[in-house]
């Protein structure tokens, strides 16, 4: 599976790594020979993931919306690996609700994790990368951040914020640090499975030109490319990987 020789030995932090896109991405970078440090709020799931994948270099249980938790996770990575070369900020949540019935506490929680967590992790990584003279910051946004989707007003707004955060950081940290975000469409993750019945999934697939959900491994492959030297001139980009879902009207 390994394709990018330059990723061998790179110190990579991946948040939201106990399942879904984060876990698939961690596996991909480990296959590339990177030193993978995984982060997730679910300590039990994180420990099970680390046990299943002894090739991962280490882990830290952290709530990315808590600044002290984030600082502690980076400190642990510093202790184990001596720094960071690549951040893949992927932790996030979504809760299906119509906009007029979203409790404000839920709105704040989604924003704090999906956008606040991206900011806190990027700040810690960016400071380290700028000091050492290089690095790559990658964030998971969403096609929901590029256009309106019903029932996810808080999630959509948070992911739109991630896209603009990406562009701002890319401008501020260039040319030393590259910053990009990935905008997946529908991905068949445990989170998606929990929210959609089989009938709902089939209906969604009918509206996607490629007629299927993405596999988490396909998102991980894009992250590997964006961290590689082949992407060395790409920064400030929001890259869609959605099977053509947002290309235009499809029927």
Predicted features and spans:
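Short C-terminal tail/terminal secondary-structure segment
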Residues: 2-3, 147, 235-251
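Short, small/polar-rich loop/turn modules that mediate ligand/substrate recognition or access, typified
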Residues: 88, 174, 178, 234-236
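Substrate-binding pocket helix/loop in short-chain dehydrogenase/reductase
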Residues: 98-99, 103-108, 204
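Active-site helix of classical SDR
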Residues: 122, 158, 166
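Alpha-helical segment proximal to the catalytic Tyr-Lys
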Residues: 127, 170-175, 232
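Residue(s) in the substrate-gating loop at a strand-loop-helix junction
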Residues: 142
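C-terminal helical subdomain
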Residues: 181, 202-230, 234, 241-243
């Amino acid at each position: 599976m390994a394709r990018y020789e330059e990723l061998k030995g790179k110190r990579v932090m991946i948040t939201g790594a106990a399942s879904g896109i984060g876990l698939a991405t961690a596996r991909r970078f480990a296959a590339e020979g990177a030193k993978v440090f995984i982060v997730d709020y679910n300590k039990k799931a994180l420990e099970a993931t680390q046990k299943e994948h002894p090739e991962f270099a280490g882990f830290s249980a952290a709530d990315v919306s808590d600044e002290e938790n984030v600082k502690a996770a980076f400190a642990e990575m510093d202790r184990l690996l001596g720094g960071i070369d690549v951040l893949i900020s992927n932790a996030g949540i979504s809760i299906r609700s119509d906009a007029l019935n979203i409790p404000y506490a839920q709105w704040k929680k989604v924003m704090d994790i999906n956008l606040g967590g991206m900011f806190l992790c990027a700040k810690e990584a960016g400071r380290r990368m700028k000091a050492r003279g290089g690095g790559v910051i990658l964030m998971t946004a969403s096609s929901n951040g590029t256009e309106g989707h019903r029932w996810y007003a808080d999630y959509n707004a948070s992911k739109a914020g991630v896209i603009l955060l990406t562009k701002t950081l890319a401008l501020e940290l260039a040319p030393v640090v590259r910053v990009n975000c990935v905008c997946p469409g529908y991905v068949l993750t445990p989170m998606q499975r929990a929210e959609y019945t089989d009938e709902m999934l089939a209906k969604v697939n009918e509206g996607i030109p490629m007629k299927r959900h993405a596999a988490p491994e396909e998102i991980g492959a894009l992250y590997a490319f964006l961290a590689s030297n082949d992407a060395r001139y790409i920064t400030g980009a929001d890259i869609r990987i959605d099977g053509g879902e947002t290309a235009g009207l499809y029927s």
